Structures are given as C-alpha cells and as structure tokens.
C-alpha cells in the first residue's frame, strides 16, 4: 500500500465551524488541521514515471495553503469491508489513464488535533464530531489502513437446526438475524422445511424475511379487517384498486410494476439512432410515475439514507416495463421540531430522542443534501416537494401523548417517459440469461426491508447500522445509459424483463424477476460481482448494495447487450438462467454446495395472510383558545414555522434545469421566490405539451379526523395542480403514500377509515385513479431514558402526489402577482363555503395546541366545480396569478403572492365571516386568483354557479406595504419587506449552519432590499431572427461531436440545441475515442457537455481531462482537433472544467483559469443574470452587451488563477466572454447574484482566436423560452441563448 499526502481537506470556515462545535461540546481543543491522505493498493510497484503520473492525478481541488501537521493524528477512512464511491471512481480514472498496476485507490482524512489531555468521554465526543460511524472508522495510524484492502477467504453459509431443535432454533435465529418474522411465518417456515426434510440455511431465511417483510409484501394493506367487531368486505388495497375499477381511463399499467404508467402526449422524442446521430422520433410519450419513502435509513444516517432513497426511486422508474427514462423528481421531508440553535421557537419543547437516531435538525441539514446530490449527479431535476415539522404533546385518539416525526418521512418520487411497446414486461424465455447490471456486491445494507418494517428502536443498534446503504449516482447514470440504449432500439430492445435491486438485494430481486414471469432460475453465487471475497453467501445474496438492476436477455442478444455495456463502462454479469420449473437454485462453486434450493412457492407463494381486529377511537381535544393570541405575534410565528417559511435552503442545492425540459420549477418570477404550486415539464424539445406534478399532505389533521386528513391531502394536490392546462380530472393520476404507526391504539381503524374516504368515496366521485403508492407501517420511535419508557408516535400520514398531462405548458399560472398588467382584482375562492375550522392548523401548532375540529372537503362537487371553471380560465389565459390556500391560511397565500410579485397589497376581508384569526389563518380548501378588474365580476359568477363561494378581497398597491382591513378597521399592516425578512429567516439560519455563513448572510440581506430589481433583461439583438437559416438551406449539416464521459448528464439537451441550429449532432462517448471507434477528424465542432464526469472525484472535470492527457491516442486526437484552424469547440459546466485543464493542448488558452469549489462550498442551482462582454468568441457574435438570465448548476465554478497578475492578464486579453451581473447591470460581487464567488463575476472565457469557448452556466438548458424559470412575456419560441448555437453554424459556413 502506497500512502500519498494530499491537499488540505477543510477551508477556513469549515475549520471554524468545527472549532465552534468543539467549544459547544466543552472540548479543550486549540487547533485542528485536516488534509486528504490517498491510499493506493498496487498489484506491483510503480516506476518513477508512473508514480509521478499517479501523484499528478491525485493533485486536485482549490489551492488551500497547507502546512506541516502538528498535534494528535485521528485518521478517518471508509469502513473496512466497504468501497467508497470516491474509491471506485478514482480507480476508474487511474485505469483510464493507463495505470493498470493500481488495484484500488482510497481516500481518508487525517485530522491533526492540538488539545489538552482529553478524557475517554471527551475523546469519544471528538471522534463523533470528526466522523460518521455509520460509514467511517477512526484509525490510529496511516499504516492501519491496510485493513481497507485486506482480502479474506470466503465464509460458508450456516444452517438453523429446526429438525432437531424445533421452533426454538428459528426463534433465536429470528432475533439474531433481525428477520422480523411473525409467529405465523415461523410456523409456516417450520411446516415447509419439515416437509422438505431439511434445515433452512441462514441465506434462505434472510431471503424469505426480506421478500415477505411488510416493506415488500404490504401485509397490512392486503390484510383481512374486523373493525369494532364488524368484518370488513375489502382490504385496504382493494379499496385503492377501486379507483381504477371506477376510472380506468388513460391508465396503461397499475399495481404490477415498479411504477404506474398513464397515457401521455404524442411528441418528438429526441435521442440518437444506432448510428449515433440524434433525431426526433414522433411517438406517444407515455408517463410513468412513482413515489417512494426511505424513512428508516434517513433516521439513522440522513445523507446516505436520503441519497439512496432517491436512487432507489430513480431505479424503479428506469426498470418500468422493458426499460424507460426517468425525467423529473420531487422530494419531501416531515420531521419533528428543528430547534435551530439560537432560533428555538416557543412551541418547540425538548422531549429527547434515542441515541441511535439523529436529531431532526441533523436530518434537515444532511438528508436534503443527500437526496439532492444523488439527483444532481444522476442528472434528474428535482422540481417540487414539501417540508413539514411537527412534534407536539396533544390530546388525540389515545389520550395525551407526544405525536411527531422522530422517525422522519423522506419522500422521493418523480415521473418519466416510456415507449408504448415497452409498457408491459416481456416474456422471459426458457434459457434466458439472468443478469445483474451495476456495481459490485458489498457488505452493506443488510436486512433493510425487515429493519424498515420495525418501529425505530425495536431492532438492535448493530442491525440498524447494517441496514444503511451507500450511494454512487454516477454508476446509476451509467446503468441508465445502458437502459436508454436498449429502449431506443425499439423492437430490437434486448431487455425482456427488468427489475431494480432494492430491499433485500438480489435475494428479493432475482426471485421477483423470475416469479413475475412464471419462471424459475438456476444461479451461480460466484458470478455475482463482488469486491469483498470474504463475504458469506447470505451477505453476497442479501446485501443492498445500490445502483443495481436485474434483467433477462435472450442468449442470442447477449453480445449486443455486452457491447452496449462496454461502451457505457457499465459493469454487468450473467448470474443465472431462466428455467421452466418455478424453482430457485443457487449454486456455490467455491464450496461446491447449494446455499438455496427451494420451490418458489415456499418463498413467495402462500405465506400466511394477516388479519387485523381493531377498534375505533375518537379524538377529544379542546378548541383553540384565541383569546391569548395577538395577531402580530401570530404572524411572526406562522412565518417562521418551517412548514410555511421560505424553503430556499432545500431548493438551490438541487439541479432544476438539467434535461432542458423543465418549464416550471419551485422558483417563481424575476425575484426567484420559492412558492410554485406544482412542477411542469415539456414532453420534448419540439412541443408545448407536457407533464405536471404536485403534492398534497395535511398530516396533523389525522390527530383529529382521519377521514379529513385524507380528503384534504387529495384536495390539496388538486388545488396545487389546478393552475396548469390539464382539462379533465381523468388526465390526473395520484400516488398515495401511507405512513402509520400500525398497532397504536386507534390508528389501524383510522387508517382503514382514511383509505375508505378516498378509495371508495372521494376519488371515484371525482373520476381520479390511484394507480400507484407505497406504505410504511412502523412510524413510531420508542426508547428508554433513565429508566423511563418514551415514545414519539407519528400521526397517520398520507402524502398524495398528483401527476397530470398538460396540454399547453405555456399557459401555466404561477403565484407571481403581476403589477404590469393594468387594473386587476384579487378573488378569494372558498370551497368550504365560509367555514373557519382551525383544528390541526399551523396557527394551533405554533401555540402548542391542536384545536377541536379539522377542516375537510365537505362537498366533492365544490372541488369538481372549482377545477372545471379554473381549467377553462387557464385555457383562456384569463388568470394572471394563482395560489392555493393551505398551511398558514389566507394570510400566507397573500404574502407569498406579494413576495413573488414584489408588490404591495390592499386587502379587505369585510365579506368574510369569522374572527380576524379565523379569517386569516384557517386552512380550509381555497385559492386566490388575480384577474383583470374588468373580468372579475363575470369570473366570480362562474365560480358561484358551481357552488364555490367567491370574495373580491382587494388588489395591488405600489407601496412596499401589506394592508389588511375589515372595511374601515385596520386588521394588520406591515411592510412587505419586513414580512419577507421574517419569512426568510428560517432558511437563512439553516444555510448559515450548513454552508458558508457569509454567503448565507449576503443572500438574506439581498432579500431585505425592497427595491431590488430582480432579473432584468437587455438585448442587443432579436432572438427570433434565425441567422443560421441561409446556411441550413444549403442542405449540408456540419458534424458536431456531442462529447460525454461517464457521469456526464447534459448531452441530450446540448445535442438538441445544436440540432436546431442546423448541425448533425452525434453522440460521442470518451470510450469511442479511447478505443479508436470514432475519430475527431470527422467533426467540424466539438462540445464537451455538463454533468459529473467520474462523479467529480479528483476535481470537477480534472479526471476527465487527465484521462485525455495521459492517454496517447486521446491526447493526439484532441491535440490535432484543437490545432485545426477550422474547428470550433464549446465546453459547458463539467465540459468547461475539463477543457480548462487541457490548456497545454489548446492554442490561445494560456490565460484560462481553473474552476474550483464554490465560495458557498455548496452545489448552486440558480437562475442568474449574465452579460456578454466584448470578446472574439465565435459563439457570441452580435450578442455583446446583452444581459440575460441563464441556468446555473454547479459545485465547482469559482475561477482560480495562479495569482493576481494572472487574473489581470486574463482581463487584459480581451477574452472574457461572460460575467455575472446584478439587476442593475453592475458586476455581481455578492452571493447569490454571483453564485460561486468568482472574481469580477467571471464565468465564461474563450481562446484568443475565439474558436474555443468555455463557460460554467448552461445555455443548452434554456435555448427554448419555455425552459426558462422566468422570461419576459414577449419572448417567442427561441430564447436569446439560441443565438449562440446559430452563431456556431454561421461560423462553420
């Protein structure tokens, strides 16, 4: 093992945060210094040249001053027996650079701590601050890291001797292995193995436990029910299926695959043909939808828990039918009170928690980063979601107890597209090859299905830790590229059948694969790719290593599939063959035995069916005491409640523009305020049809009324999607995610009541189907605190996600109030017809009360009538702004609309009944719309005719003021800016804790500027003019290489932009260059695309660049291309970072900077203003002086020059192409207008001759106007950024 010292690991502010944490923990630490240490396992020694090459590869990242280490060494590495994602990707880079002697690279962090003598307890506290024991260990010395590369002999399986010891043996194994088997399941297993006349092996028991866990089998939803002594006719699942039986319209697949599928629009799907040339393919683009939860792992270790939750849901989408394409995602979190240090709120008590789970604050600081990072690296925009905090001592169905979310809800979901012929799974032919696609097996994530099926605290701490997985999104991206290549082949798609690998690992995935196709399988254990030879058969077969799929391919198509995998560098292995007999055999060639030899019917067939015999409990809770509430204090509390408050800290960490198909993300208007009701995507680059997603959840209401909570969740999801052009309820489908503390008094009967309310009543009445969903039935946390038993039990929690087909995405209405549209009126639409129920409201919560009566949707017809009228108004473009009433009531609805429009309001509530608090803060179903003053009366009449009460409540004012009156009486008045400051303080506090606090402060101060102009556009050209048209008419399309490396994810939208400009866009993978299949000699242009090549390990774009510089063939190809006078090249984001590291072979680029970690030290996804500078770039001809917004999505965009003189030389060269500017057109120096902290706002630069340009922002994602988060009304189909690509076409001639 070679030990290679690296760069400092922590910036100054990260060291400061660590020192503050030590101080808060009363640790006598005076100084901490940290640096990376690289560990190289070698097959044979390196020569001097190879060593120098390896050291060069391992030199990356920003230039932070290092110094001689002093103090006690604490060396943190990944846990032995695991391989970190960093390791696999860094090793890939080394191999692609020709360093075949490097068996594996790994990285640790060496902390050097100067401190007084620490007690054993203090040492434990310090180690807890420096590493995550879920995924890391603390080693005493560098040499001890040899354990990371240790290779042990394979372990054997063990048997449980039930034949001799009977039931007791299985009961002991049940506890030891964490199987969570019920008594009747133990009886079932004993009966079957006695019949088979043999003892079960541990691997068989684990496989059975995972496949039959509540997590996988949904026993409660399939159970027989008796409630209050009365036998119920339907199971929960049958009531959900009732929605499909009543309204099967437009549903193509439900209840049987990894995701549901609904009929989509016909549009031009854009992808490369087998020859690599991108083309449009006009066909139905059906919509798949899925929403998952990953609650248990997120409670234990939030970052990997949320990351793998997102990754698993993405795999579900990709493994639908015979392979499909994930498109856009969503996320949601529900946790107990945050108790932000220095910002603890009056309603946030301190009830404690078990040691094995993290705090709600830690979940929300780390979990969203994990989910966002996976989506970012995979290349899926996350464009809607929700966040709720709730933890309260309440009187509910079970008397007075603490209800909350110590076991959090972590929601991951999304939609995708699938070809018509691939919606249904194919036939697995006898003899078909059964394949695992993706990364290797590792000894992680054991027993996750069973563990997540237990209440937090029931399993042992070791088993909790074992059930957490690790994420590698770049590997999943490679697998998805393989799936894409397969479905793009249409009729010749080699995939017959596909499933993702999730809970239970291969032990669940392979049996499910063959069983669903009425086949059996013969498998060879040693064919499973594994980087840990010492694993037992149980560990190999049952681990939940991520980023894996199982699929079947006919033998005659195996070579075709293998070639696709080789090009995409996606590992795969043939593990077995399909058999006619439905029997499962797993052979172990190492020990020459069969760890599994079972009929599939024992594993999956007739396990005992659950019965639930439960009683109903009624909640008794006093009414909210309004007498003690002062309105101004209520406003302050409501606006700082995380459920209501600004959620920027959850949004800007996630890429919202990748694919170039996002029409509506969370950020609204020129001031980019996060208040959007729904997410909208375009079907394709050549259409205006699309898809929409929205969410609805009102979980605290279930503490008063289960029925109301469910009805309100469905209604809210509809209200949130109503501002899009959908047309009919039948074009909306719902996902229902049910969370419940099953077995808790009153909760089982309440769950049945809630399912019945929407499955038998509401949804059938509306004509809406629920074709997909998920349940999590163990939402309770139990622990002992100094001899006292404590529990925190969640409310029954239904999270609804609505998916809709959009007819015209241009007609979507947002909450942005328009002060530039002439006289207008605000109409309040009340579907409750004047009721003001405050039970379960945010107002009650912030005063530590629950209230007595929950709001509900009393009349289904009101929602149906509202939607009908609203859809007609949207289609007619008669509504200027729209926002629903929900958490925080009418007051929140109004101020959020004012924030988005940067306008004042004059409101009169005289026509509304109730107290001031009731009128402003009730959360009955409703909405506010802004319409033309001339049309207001007629529009109001349309709603009234459908039974919806409509109030004219006022309009806009130019002053920075929110005035709310009751006739002549002033109810409330304050400046909009003061309210925005309150609303944004929660996100500021979270950002300051998590990110660079200086950046957080600058953003918070910007939000307090009443006169901030927002995004302002100034164009020096007509974007509708097609300067390339004369050249396109010549009929010859110049060839553009759309270059990607493994992990790149922005190539399709780049190809579409160049295709529109008249180029022949061709898909070129780096493996094509390295293998010699393709030469750059064929191309007039090259574009290096954005994404996460090699997951950005070894520096963003640096690994990609070094794989070119250290490979003779690649270096020659690129050198010749750049030296050719007629060639042009563009590098965007990751491609920009990569090309900046090729300066030595790009003429005229000597003055280019490197691009390193953003000043915020956070991935930044923003819609930022840039201005085109005077420069020679061929791409910016005729655009100089133009100021336009553009998508920004990167973690390493800060320009780094060698010194101040190098920056001055670059400025003097005249090659600066783009700068970030503020709304006044001045160079942006403050965050987030300058999102990465680059000197002088620099974000684009070109060579001295202008042929090669690199830039960090993404013009390819916004070349269509509809793909911009905001744009002026007068823009046509093409945004101004389309001019860049047309300029390139003009240059080629």
Curated annotation (Swiss-Prot):
Binding site for ATP: 305-316, 384-386, 676, 886
A GO biological process held by the record: 'de novo' IMP biosynthetic process
Pfam family, one: FGAR-AT_linker
Main localization of the protein described in the UniProt heading: cytoplasm
InterPro entries: Class_I_gatase-like, FGAR-AT_N, FGAR-AT_PurM_N-like, PurL_large, PurL_linker, PurM-like_C_dom, PurM-like_C_sf, PurM-like_N_sf
Protein origin, superkingdom: Bacteria
Keyword Glycoprotein: no
Boundaries of every Glutamine amidotransferase type-1 domain copy: 1040-1293
EC code(s) of this entry: 6.3.5.3
Active site: 1133, 1258, 1260
UniProt keywords, alphabetically: ATP-binding, Cytoplasm, Glutamine amidotransferase, Ligase, Magnesium, Metal-binding, Nucleotide-binding, Purine biosynthesis
Similarity field: In the N-terminal section; belongs to the FGAMS family.
General function of this protein: Phosphoribosylformylglycinamidine synthase involved in the purines biosynthetic pathway. Catalyzes the ATP-dependent conversion of formylglycinamide ribonucleotide (FGAR) and glutamine to yield formylglycinamidine ribonucleotide (FGAM) and glutamate.
Protein name, UniProt field: Phosphoribosylformylglycinamidine synthase
Gene behind the chain: purL
